Amino acid sequence: MLSLKLPQLLQVHQVPRVFWEDGIMSGYRRPTSSALDCVLSSFQMTNETVNIWTHFLPTWYFLWRLLALAGGPGFRAEPYHWPLLVFLLPACLYPFASCCAHTFSSMSPRMRHICYFLDYGALSLYSLGCAFPYAAYSMPASWLHGHLHQFFVPAAALNSFLCTGLSCYSRFLELESPGLSKVLRTGAFAYPFLFDNLPLFYRLGLCWGRGHGCGQEALSTSHGYHLFCALLTGFLFASHLPERLAPGRFDYIGHSHQLFHICAVLGTHFQLEAVLADMGSRRAWLATQEPALGLAGTVATLVLAAAGNLLIIAAFTATLLRAPSTCPLLQGGPLEGGTQAKQQ
């Protein structure tokens, strides 16, 4: 009879440095786990379990929203809706890629890096996906058909390449320069977010203090919730609070990466609601403007960006595979001090 045994968990001093997490002292899986061990570990309480499920379940929520909207009467046949549908594709992809990365990252040091390369690529595509509905529905009136509007989506595609490249490169610096690694990775994701949300920041500044007299430039409440969740997400990612203040207390539940996941998916939910609000409230006004990028152009841009990001990931993966097994990136040294784990 087939017998499945849950994998044994380890303390931080029992795993190579490449697997350490800041402030997480226990609940580590074996760094040579099989794929089956990794899947089984998602059903036992490890320091990754909540990370896995907080992105696995939202994947199905966003997929349900995509199918529900796409299956609506006449929704797919209306070109006005296409940017929203294309946005929802990477909105489904990024939590799924994150879930897979957290599930299979304990198979080996090389596999850990490759898993997160793919995770970063999916996040980069999500940053591009955000640009489609913002360009179609959320641009300020004074920006329509200007240079920024015309190049908004192509610039977002280039930003996705920069995001993937910097974030993947940051993993090569983790052990020798953890501070620089964290700065590069945080900047890699903060910059596309700031660029994508330029239309919202401008509309917010334009309407500040004007109450209800802002017309089509007014932001919905969902926009505010989205921006707040994004700010909180960035803070949690950069600070590693609360586990940094009490190492070992939040190993299984309540550490920053779990809270980061929850805030990220809540932010995406509110972003979707905000886009739907802009679609509805600005439709009559946008109908008088020139049509946005068609479905073929929208999908082609996303596909080309996905191909470019995969090439970047392939280049970093090839570099990783050529590295000797003895290099610090793949091994790390013994625990020094026993109180701090490295930053992810």
Curated annotation (Swiss-Prot):
GO terms for cellular component: plasma membrane. It is a multi-pass membrane protein. Keywords: Cell membrane, Lipid-binding, Membrane, Receptor, Steroid-binding, Transmembrane, Transmembrane helix. Brain specific. Highly expressed in the hypothalamus, also expressed in forebrain, amygdala, corpus callosum and spinal cord. Belongs to the ADIPOR family. Plasma membrane progesterone (P4) receptor coupled to G proteins. Seems to act through a G(s) mediated pathway. Involved in neurosteroid inhibition of apoptosis. May be involved in regulating rapid P4 signaling in the nervous system. Also binds dehydroepiandrosterone (DHEA), pregnanolone, pregnenolone and allopregnanolone. This is Membrane progestin receptor delta. It comes from Homo sapiens. The gene is PAQR6.
